[in-house]
Amino acid sequence: MPQKKTSQQKAEATPAKRQKSSTERIFGPAVMSHGFTGVPNILVRGQKRLGLNTAQFNILVQLLSYWMDPAKPPFPSKRKLLERLDMSETTLQKHIRDLEAQGFLRRQQQTTAAGDFGSNIYHLDGLVRKLKKLAPDFDDERAEREAARQKTERPNA
């Protein structure tokens, strides 16, 4: 029976076709072989402005990690979320209700073929809208930083 390859061995066996991303250079191919989650910097830097507490932020990041296709919203089970988060089911449910009330997400209950309740589908269009609304503020702040940098580098220009 062949021996399973480790993440490191698989990553090293992959032919070098492209230059490694900065993320891959930081974390290495073994870590990156398990994938990554795209988290917009506006979400990270704007957490306070968005009114997100740490638990809510972490829940959103977990949901983002399940969102692979823009046309297919994530639908992790509460059990899967709880395996990743250090909180009780009651606390998770409260934070999800709060995120829904704040307009970050919308839940849609799935049902199985037998008519039983399945996991929720989490529509994150509210989060996307809120981040797009914040983008101009971040553009302005970037322009101000650039102007200050230019002034420092060329004070008499």
Residue ranges and their predicted role:
Residues 1-84, 90-91:
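Short recognition helix of helix-turn-helix/winged-helix DNA-binding domains
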Residues 58, 121-123, 157:
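Generic structural signal for residues positioned in beta-strands
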Residues 90-148:
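Winged-helix/helix-turn-helix nucleic-acid-interaction surface
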Residues 1-30, 126-157:
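Charged low-complexity intrinsically disordered patches
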